[in-house]
Amino acid sequence: MGRKWANIVAKKTAKDGATSKVYAKFGVEIYVAAKQGEPDPELNTALKFVIDRAKQAQVPKHVIDKAIDKAKGNTDETFVEGRYEGFGPNGSMIIVDTLTSNVNRTAANVRAAYGKNGGNMGAAGSVSYLFDKKGVIVFKGDDADSIFELLLEADVDVDDVEAEDGSITVYTAPTDLHKAILALRESGISEFQVTELEMIPQSEVTLEGDDLAVFEKLVDALEADDDVQKVYHNVADV
């Protein structure tokens, strides 16, 4: 599983990096986190979390600094979170999380991306009840038992700890992700491949041939929208 999450980040970074969309999306997320609290990551846990994720995605320091500087200024641009759920081919399900300054524009764009690429946008809640929100942390290591005990001693609500191919993957309750990261840092672990809040499907489907091609095109179209921050789905190995 550790390799899976690290591969997802690597694929997304490689794909988004060609157009720098990942920089712009993290820029917005950093701006919002800094604007809603202190523009200092040492005083703002949410901001520090976003910056750590940005670094994992290889976002340059100047992009991070620019977003924080913007939040320190007189700019009063307002961003609103949104969620759009829908369906792709052959049992595939998708959740799209957005952060936008224009809800009407974003809703229209996401609906069009679904409709023009073999998908259908559903009602709120039509898909998300089949996913579980969890914190996911991935770092190098092989002793899952000691990590599990360490987190329990730190009073972290741990769902599971897995070790595979030299990586450890920790699943936590979403409210305890920050606490888990802090406990791991205090134990001497300083580098993480993944620290994310994820919507994890309760079961996965496997797509092949034309269905897989349609699904990948649909996900690409959704991720290409500047207002889309995260796309979750239930398709295995994508």
Curated annotation (Swiss-Prot):
GO molecular function, one term: DNA binding
UniProt xrefs under InterPro entries: Integrase-like_N, TACO1_YebC-like_2nd/3rd_dom, TACO1_YebC_N, Transcrip_reg_TACO1-like, Transcrip_reg_TACO1-like_dom3, Transcrip_reg_TACO1_YeeN, YebC-like
Pfam families: TACO1_YebC_N (PF20772), Transcrip_reg (PF01709)
Keyword Transcription regulation belongs to the record: yes
Single biological process term from Gene Ontology: regulation of DNA-templated transcription
Keywords per UniProt: Cytoplasm, DNA-binding, Transcription, Transcription regulation
Cellular component, GO annotation: cytosol
UniProt subcellular location: Cytoplasm
Domain of life of the organism encoding this protein: Bacteria
Record family assignment: Belongs to the TACO1 family. YeeN subfamily.
HAMAP family hit by this protein: Transcrip_reg_TACO1, Transcrip_reg_TACO1_YeeN
Protein name as catalogued: Probable transcriptional regulatory protein Sez_1681
Species the sequence originates in: Streptococcus equi subsp. zooepidemicus (strain MGCS10565)
